[in-house]
């Protein structure tokens, strides 16, 4: 305590001193001194023993410490510091320093500042956040676990039966019950055989295994003509002997397993068309008492052959007897027919009949079996179900509408399965063309004689004047159509207006007939037309409305009262004074209409429409009944059609778009109409067209535009003889692009024939015009006047196997496909007639192939075969998509190939009898043709020439592998995995789904623009778009329920068969059935998102992932402006590992507000407007005329748009630009790009090497020429600076420079932009010297991989990327054309600017002195070539593989090789920027001009924009007469 007291006293003393200092001159007491005094008093009063005293002392100590601090602070500020400053400033200092020391100090300061700037400011590129390359994701596989041949669920009879009757298409419940209620089953023990010729019905295997055999070599020895025998020849009956199948008499065709039909497509057509006549007799020959077998068919003369055929069919055992009345009615024919007396037709001027008597068509064989020469043997105990023929006959009578639909489905599949396979795959050209040739005898109907004299001459004179008036610039070969003033009004009318017009016409005819009894004839010049009408109606009086025979003056009054466009109300019995009368304009129009009506009548009779049904009173009343006509118009809505504008049929029906059942019409289906009435109704749709000699009316491989009736002249049915051979020997680039990882993975090059497709992909070595001007055609048949061209292809809506060419100047009547399809919908007898004719004309070889081929329908994810399975069949894709995968050793899967429509799988394995090289599964629901190995073996033994076609196919695959080994070796990405060849995944796409990422994306507007771009680009066979409204309008409100599922699938399959590309627009809610349909039907899914929106995963993406779709998925980002911010694309791709098809940037203006994905329901106005726009776009393909005397391309060509770029990608027509390396010589590439842009050539994909990678990246970033010039010029200026090069030198341990200046120059051009943000697809290649391979980079920082691709060894350091060292890509491949081809590019512009090799011969001996070589280099008088230096040897060694790759690139199909004259410029001549740029620009202009002049293939050519459809449709150039 003494210490504390002493301390306190000292503190008091110091505080007193402070108080004295601070309190001087202040009268008021100091608060600090007062506090200290008070604390001291308290401490003294209480002492140290109490707590209060202790606290007071602590406070006293704190106050004393504060006072001491204040004291010293005030002293330092007021006394010490001023004193020190005064002393410092008053002192004199002298520093002595020499210049060396000063320079060293300044140098140190400059070095420090330079270090800060160099490593803290100028190398910002090295401090960018790491963004590694995006790995190409593996394709998700969700294969079905069901084994082949085992059905899901309970494998019972019902499942197997339903699987077998899928071949009939969609069957409603009543139709299904009617077809199966008389079905019988038959048990077969193992080894039991039975003759299918005795089975008059549809047979299918419910349980077990059956082998199908056909008569073999003994038949060929008896009939030595082999497969080329006449189909009408007599065949021996098989009733006399039934040898065992193991003998030589029979060959094994195929094996039929559970759920597969034993009957063929031909058998089904035979069962449905038993009672259909081959040729419908004219009305003049019809007897009033003839009857028909069913309500579907009109009265036709039943011959004795048909009656006997019916007797034989009705006497078949196990056939129900409920058709006794029908058979008895067939037998109770007039006696004179039974006696075979000749029938004398009445005298008439009607010339529609044949001028010479037609001999009856001989029967194919003595039996009417639907299974000729076929027997079956059960391998195991088997259950067979049989639907008798009587069930089919009963179905025709009860449900004729459903029957027509089934026949349509069967006929379509027969064309797609049997005929297409025989023609394209087996090379049976003669057999298929024989059908076309022999069909002419059924489709010939002559015009009336009075239309062949002066009337025909006047018609020719009109066309002659028009041809003379046309200029040389007009292409007459496209055809000149006769002007029809009513055609425009007809096109603008709807189905409802047509119905009202028809009713009005019928009512007027009845009114006239009631007033014409007491009339007088007032002849005038127009009576010629009425005379012709009288001639035409001479044989149709029984079917016409009852007119009186007296002349009528009311006719002329009516003619004056109404418009000339309504000239349907005239008296057909007014006779003219003279036929040689000068016709006025209106009468000329009437004569033209008369020609149209007469041609239509001949057409209708040729296709099976006759007026014989008019003799029936009920039929007459039906024709005149407005209620029934309206009902019939509505009835056609429920039929399946292949309309070009099939989705518009909803406007013809009810307002809600619903349709009635197929079976609702029942027995009310009217008989065949009167051809005259139908011709009057449709005459405005008929065109009379003139084609000069040599014009092509129908091209081989295209869909028939319609029916051509020859009025005068000759048409030649021919085939391109070497078309198939060229496809086999010289496969197109599309074929060579398939991803084949091994020789076992092959595919067929035989697709649907596409004329001139080869020339579009043959590079600049093929003259397209020369190919078109000199086709190698082989004539098949000649169509004379009265004949019909395009009958089979038009009625069946399938591609044409033939080519129709004008043999002479020809005048034809043309009825478009849409009109034909409407007729087929309303009158099913047209389909049945053609089916009957086909069954009568088919050669036996085609029939046997039809029995062996199997039509399969597999579900999405279902496995067709597994890796290592036995190769028992070849598969051909009808529609859908398949993927072949193989297992990797690490447990993953590699995609080997994808197969689309028309491609085949497994030929090599079947021929070599090896096991499958991979697992094949369906990406989506797919239809296949199964070509069994047993059929191939049978054909090889019986007809060895058939196997030549398949042998050529396999040889072409092997040749493609040899010519382009990269397709077999695959492409390695940066991780070393085998990436998926994109060409195989974008090749032959048939369906594309447009799916929004989330609600609010304008997918409807996007799909409309995409469809327009596809139309202009020229998608093969056209493109169409489907949304939910279109499907509901066409199929009704039950389209998406269980009942309509098969109906919807059949409708979608027909659309895929008809169009080259179908776009499914998911414009409904995320859980709607239509959204599920879009995803399930897609070969490729376009995920459309708004670039400015949130990159989070949307609800539609979750829905798609939940469906486990294995289709290709492409991300499409919509931008308001043509620019993408850096890093934006990476944010979208980061969470979407399932995007395995790349991404696209598309500029499309849209409202920033949320756009409802499914707008609320509105009246039919908007829907009608959308459909009218689509209709106009379709018509524009055929009516638009190209502007003459203009270049192929213009700078503002719309083909450079983003939608056109996406359309070319989907169609496999992408244009690639490959830029090679060459240092400063690469500046010439900028000039070539400018020339291409001015020529209007679009560029979709850019790839480059070295300096080409730099130029290509600049162009891909902006997709424009202007921005790249400035950036490239700045970079060239930096590279030309010697000071920068000198400052960048370093000790040459790894390179001569540090690479900083080089990096800085590239970074200033690109910044932190990533390759994903480039507007165009881009890649650059490098050489990975760590792993000794080439690598291609499509993601990551652009400057980084461009720098790596430009890293010249020795001059620059290699770049380290994920542990690997990357150098210049030119060491391996300086012109990456093969990789560009693998990305799916169709046409490739390759610009080579590399240095030329010095091939000077060397002879410096076995040893060489370095001193001699040095002096020899500087000796101007030496005649010995200078030996290469060490650096030159190393450089040549490095580029050895690149030279070989360059030579392969020059000869690659589809590659247009360009090399500007830049040999005089060096690698580092960057200072000559403008000079080199000018050389490239001038060369590009000259090269493209020469290419265009000599007809070289450019990416926008004549085949785009729908020009092919201009020549043969309703819109050839009209004659203004």
Swiss-Prot record:
Q: What segment(s) does the record annotate as region Disordered?
A: 280-301, 315-372, 738-768
Keywords (alphabetical) are:
Endoplasmic reticulum, Hydrolase, Lipid degradation, Lipid metabolism, Membrane, Repeat, Transmembrane, Transmembrane helix
- Where along the chain is the active site annotated? 1250 (nucleophile), 1368 (proton acceptor)
Q: Which residues lie on this side of the membrane: Lumenal?
A: 72-96
Q: Where does a nucleoside 3',5'-cyclic phosphate 1 bind?
A: 670-789
> Its membrane topology, per UniProt?
Multi-pass membrane protein
Q: Where is the composition biased (Polar residues)?
A: 316-334, 738-753
What does UniProt list under activity regulation? Inhibited by organophosphorus esters.
- GO terms classed as biological process: glycerolipid metabolic process; lipid catabolic process
Where does the chain bind a nucleoside 3',5'-cyclic phosphate 2? Answer: 837-957
EC assignment: the record states 3.1.1.5
Gene3D superfamilies in UniProt: Cytosolic phospholipase A2 catalytic domain, Jelly Rolls
Please report, in chain numbering, the residue ranges of the motif GXSXG. 1248-1252
Q: Where are the transmembrane segments?
A: 51-71, 97-117
Q: Which residues lie on this side of the membrane: Cytoplasmic?
A: 1-50, 118-1521
Return the protein name. Answer: Lysophospholipase NTE1
Q: Which organism is it from?
A: Chaetomium globosum (strain ATCC 6205 / CBS 148.51 / DSM 1962 / NBRC 6347 / NRRL 1970) (Soil fungus)
What lineage is on file? Eukaryota, Fungi, Dikarya, Ascomycota, Pezizomycotina
């Amino acid at each position: 305590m003494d210490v504390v007291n002493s301390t306190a006293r000292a503190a008091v003393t110091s505080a007193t001193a402070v108080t004295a200092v601070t309190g001087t001159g202040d009268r008021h007491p100091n608060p600090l001194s007062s506090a200290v005094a008070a604390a001291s008093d308290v401490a003294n009063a209480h002492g140290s023993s109490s707590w209060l005293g202790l606290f007071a002392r602590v406070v006293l100590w704190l106050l004393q410490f504060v006072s001491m601090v204040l004291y010293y602070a005030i002293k330092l500020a007021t006394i010490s510091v001023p004193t020190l400053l005064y002393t410092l400033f008053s002192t004199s200092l002298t520093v002595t320093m020499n210049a060396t020391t000063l320079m060293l100090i300044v140098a140190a300061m400059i070095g420090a500042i330079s270090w800060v700037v160099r490593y803290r400011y100028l190398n910002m590129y090295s401090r960018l956040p790491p963004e590694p390359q995006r790995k190409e994701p593996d394709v998700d596989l969700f294969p079905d676990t069901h084994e082949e041949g085992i059905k899901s669920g309970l494998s019972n009879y019902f499942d197997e039966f339903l699987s077998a009757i899928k071949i009939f298409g969609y069957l409603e419940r009543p139709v299904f019950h009617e077809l199966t209620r008389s079905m019988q089953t038959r048990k077969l023990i193992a080894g039991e055989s039975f003759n299918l010729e005795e089975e008059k019905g549809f047979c299918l295997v419910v349980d077990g295994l059956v082998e199908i055999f056909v008569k073999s070599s003994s038949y060929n020895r008896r009939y030595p003509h082999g497969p080329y025998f006449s189909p009408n020849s007599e065949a021996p009956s098989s009733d006399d002997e039934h040898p065992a199948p193991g003998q030589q008499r029979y060959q094994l065709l195929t094996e039929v397993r559970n759920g597969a039909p034993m009957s063929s497509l031909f058998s089904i057509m035979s069962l449905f068309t038993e009672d259909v006549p081959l040729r419908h007799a004219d009305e003049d020959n019809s007897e009033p008492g003839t009857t028909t077998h069913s309500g579907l068919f009109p009265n036709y003369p039943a011959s004795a052959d048909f009656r006997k055929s019916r007797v034989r069919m009705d006497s078949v055992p196990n056939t129900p007897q409920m058709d006794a009345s029908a058979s008895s009615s067939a037998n109770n024919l007039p006696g004179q027919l039974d006696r075979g007396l000749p029938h004398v037709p009445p005298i008439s001027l009607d010339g529609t009949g044949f001028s010479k008597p037609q001999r009856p068509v001989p029967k194919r064989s003595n039996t009417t079996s639907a299974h000729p020469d076929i027997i079956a043997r059960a391998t195991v105990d088997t259950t067979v179900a049989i639907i008798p023929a009587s069930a089919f006959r009963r179905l025709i009578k009860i449900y004729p509408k459903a029957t027509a639909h089934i026949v349509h489905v069967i006929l379509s599949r027969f064309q797609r399965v049997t005929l297409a396979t025989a023609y394209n795959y087996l090379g049976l050209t003669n057999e298929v063309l024989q059908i076309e040739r022999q069909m002419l005898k059924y489709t010939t109907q002559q015009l009336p004689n009075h239309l062949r004299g002066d009337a025909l001459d006047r018609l020719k004179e009109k066309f002659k004047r028009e041809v003379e008036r046309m200029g040389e610039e007009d292409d007459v070969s496209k055809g000149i159509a006769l002007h029809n003033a009513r055609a425009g009004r007809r096109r603008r009318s709807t189905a409802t207006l047509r119905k009202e017009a028809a009713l009005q016409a019928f009512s007027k005819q009845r009114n006239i007939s009631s007033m014409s009894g007491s009339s007088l004839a007032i002849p005038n010049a127009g009576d010629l037309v009425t005379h012709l009408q009288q001639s035409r109606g001479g044989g149709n009086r029984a079917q016409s409305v009852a007119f009186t025979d007296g002349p009528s003056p009311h006719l002329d009054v009516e003619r004056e009262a109404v418009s000339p466009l309504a000239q349907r109300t005239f008296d057909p019995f007014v006779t003219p004074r003279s036929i040689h009368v000068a016709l006025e304009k209106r009468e000329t129009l009437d004569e033209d209409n008369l020609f149209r009506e007469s041609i239509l009548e001949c057409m209708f009779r040729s296709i099976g429409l006759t007026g014989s049904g008019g003799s029936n009173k009920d039929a007459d009343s039906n024709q005149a009944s407005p209620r029934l006509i309206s009902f019939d118009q509505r009835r056609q809505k429920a039929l399946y059609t292949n309309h070009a504008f099939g989705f518009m049929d909803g406007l013809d029906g009810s307002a809600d778009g619903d349709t009635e059942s197929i079976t609702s019409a029942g027995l009310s289906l009217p008989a065949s109409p009167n051809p005259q009435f139908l011709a009057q109704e449709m005459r405005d749709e008929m065109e009379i067209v003139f084609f000069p000699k040599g014009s092509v009316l129908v091209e081989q491989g295209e869909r028939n535009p319609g029916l051509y009736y020859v009025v005068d002249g000759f048409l030649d049915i021919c085939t391109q003889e070497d078309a198939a051979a060229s496809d086999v020997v010289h496969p197109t680039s599309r074929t060579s692009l398939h991803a084949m990882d091994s020789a076992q993975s092959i595919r067929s090059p035989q697709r649907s024939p596409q004329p001139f497709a080869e020339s579009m992909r043959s590079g600049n070595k093929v003259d397209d015009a020369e190919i078109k001007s000199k086709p190698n055609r082989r004539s098949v048949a000649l169509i004379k006047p009265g004949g019909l061209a395009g009958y089979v292809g038009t009625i069946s809506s399938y591609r044409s196997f033939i080519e129709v060419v004008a043999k002479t100047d020809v005048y034809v009547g043309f009825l478009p496909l849409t009109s034909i399809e409407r007729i087929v919908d309303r009158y099913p007898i047209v389909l049945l007639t053609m089916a009957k004719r086909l069954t009568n004309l088919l050669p036996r070889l085609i029939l046997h192939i039809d029995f062996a081929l199997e039509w399969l329908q597999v579900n999405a994810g279902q496995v067709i075969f597994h890796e290592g399975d036995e190769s028992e069949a070849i598969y051909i894709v009808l529609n859908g998509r398949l993927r072949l995968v193989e297992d990797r050793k690490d447990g993953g899967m590699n995609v080997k190939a994808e197969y689309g429509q028309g491609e085949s799988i497994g030929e090599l394995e079947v021929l070599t009898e090896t096991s499958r090289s991979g697992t094949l599964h369906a990406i989506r629901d797919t239809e296949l043709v199964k070509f069994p190995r047993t059929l191939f073996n049978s054909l090889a033994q019986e007809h060895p020439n058939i196997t030549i076609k398949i042998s050529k196919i396999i040889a072409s695959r092997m040749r493609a592998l040899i010519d382009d080994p990269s397709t077999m070796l695959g492409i390695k990405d940066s991780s070393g995995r085998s990436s998926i060849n994109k060409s195989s995944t974008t090749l032959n796409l048939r369906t594309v789904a447009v799916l929004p990422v989330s609600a609010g994306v304008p997918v409807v507007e996007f799909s409309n623009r995409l469809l327009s771009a596809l139309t202009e680009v020229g998608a093969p066979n056209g493109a169409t778009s489907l949304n939910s409204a279109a499907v509901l309008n066409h199929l009704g409100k039950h389209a998406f329920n269980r009942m309509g599922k098969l109906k919807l699938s059949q409708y979608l399959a027909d659309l895929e068969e008809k169009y080259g590309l179908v776009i499914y627009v998911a414009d409904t809610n995320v859980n709607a059935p239509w959204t599920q349909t879009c995803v399930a039907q897609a070969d490729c899914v376009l995920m459309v998102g708004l670039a400015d929106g949130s990159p989070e995963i949307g609800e539609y993406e979750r829905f798609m992932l939940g469906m486990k779709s294995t289709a290709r998925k492409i991300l499409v980002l919509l931008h308001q402006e043509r620019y993408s911010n850096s890093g934006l694309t990476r944010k979208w791709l980061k969470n979407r590992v399932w995007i395995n098809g790349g991404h696209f940037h598309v500029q499309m203006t849209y409202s920033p507000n949320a756009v409802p994905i499914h707008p609320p329901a509105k009246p039919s106005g908007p829907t009608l407007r959308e459909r009218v726009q689509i209709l106009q776009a379709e018509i524009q393909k055929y009516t638009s005329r190209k502007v003459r005397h203009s270049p192929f391309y213009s700078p503002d060509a719309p083909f450079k748009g983003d939608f056109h770029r996406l359309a070319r990608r989907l169609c496999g027509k992408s244009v690639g630009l490959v830029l090679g390396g060459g240092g400063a010589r690469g500046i010439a590439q900028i000039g070539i790009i400018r020339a291409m842009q001015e020529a209007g050539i679009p560029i979709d994909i850019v790839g480059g090497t070295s300096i080409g990678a730099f130029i290509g990246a600049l162009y891909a970033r902006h997709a424009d020429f202007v921005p790249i010039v400035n950036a490239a010029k700045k970079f060239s200026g930096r590279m030309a600076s010697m000071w920068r090069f000198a400052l960048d030198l370093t000790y040459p341990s790894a390179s001569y420079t540090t690479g900083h200046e080089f990096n800085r120059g590239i970074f200033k051009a690109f910044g932190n932009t990533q390759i994903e943000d480039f507007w165009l697809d881009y890649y650059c290649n490098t050489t990975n010297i760590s792993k000794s391979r080439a690598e291609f980079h499509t993601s990551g920082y652009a400057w980084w991989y461009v720098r790596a691709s430009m890293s010249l060894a020795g001059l620059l350091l290699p770049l380290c990327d994920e542990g690997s060292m990357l150098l210049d890509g030119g060491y391996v491949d300086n012109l990456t054309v093969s990789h560009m081809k693998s990305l799916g590019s169709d046409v490739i512009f390759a610009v080579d600017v590399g240095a030329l090799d010095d091939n000077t011969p060397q002879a410096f001996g076995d040893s060489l002195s370095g001193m001699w070589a040095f002096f020899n280099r500087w000796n101007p008088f030496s005649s010995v070539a200078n030996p290469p230096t060490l650096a030159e040897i190393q450089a040549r060694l490095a580029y050895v593989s690149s030279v070989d790759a360059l030579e392969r690139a020059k000869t690659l199909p589809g590659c247009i090789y360009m090399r500007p004259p830049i040999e005089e410029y060096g690698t580092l001549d960057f200072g000559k920027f403008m000079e080199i740029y000018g050389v490239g620009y001038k060369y590009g202009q000259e090269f493209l001009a020469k290419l265009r002049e000599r007809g070289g293939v450019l990416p926008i050519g004549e085949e785009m924009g729908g020009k092919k459809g201009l020549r043969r449709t309703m819109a050839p150039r009209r004659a203004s007469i």
